[in-house]
């Protein structure tokens, strides 16, 4: 059930009429990656890759969170974005 809601939430993000902030996008990215991949075990990007480094750090902050917990948090976060930006 949570997986279906997670997939539906991922689709809702695509239909937002206004662009969320960069911080909100990073949070979405981190929760999505934690829910779908698990803990970040990739190499940290170099100093000059600012975007990649920000995404890596956001995902790394989710380390230890279960897939189901990350999915539920993602769903709740998307609901807030829909209320704010739809």
From Swiss-Prot:
Residues annotated for an acyl-CoA binding in this entry: 14, 29-33, 51, 55, 74
Coiled-coil regions listed in the entry: none
Pfam family, one: ACBP
Lineage of source species: Eukaryota, Metazoa, Ecdysozoa, Arthropoda, Hexapoda
Recorded family membership: Belongs to the ACBP family.
Gene from which this protein is expressed: Acbp2
Protein name (Swiss-Prot/TrEMBL): Acyl-CoA-binding protein homolog
Occurrences of domain ACB (ranges): 2-86
SUPFAM superfamilies assigned to the protein according to its UniProt record, in alphabetical order: Acyl-CoA binding protein
Its job: Binds medium- and long-chain acyl-CoA esters with very high affinity and may function as an intracellular carrier of acyl-CoA esters. May be involved in energy metabolism in a manner that depends on the substrate used for energy production. Dbi and its metabolites are involved in the regulation of multiple biological processes.
GO biological process: fatty acid metabolic process; intracellular acyl-CoA homeostasis
Protein keywords: Lipid-binding, Transport
Gene Ontology MF terms in the entry: fatty-acyl-CoA binding
């Amino acid at each position: 059930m949570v997986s279906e809601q997670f997939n539906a939430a991922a689709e809702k993000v695509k239909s937002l009429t206004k662009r969320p902030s960069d911080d909100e996008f990073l949070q979405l990215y981190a929760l999505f990656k934690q829910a779908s991949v698990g803990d970040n075990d990739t190499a940290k990007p170099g100093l000059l890759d600012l975007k990649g480094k920000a995404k890596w750090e956001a995902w790394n902050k989710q380390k230890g969170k279960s897939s189901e917990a990350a999915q539920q948090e993602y769903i709740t976060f998307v609901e807030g974005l829909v209320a704010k930006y739809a």
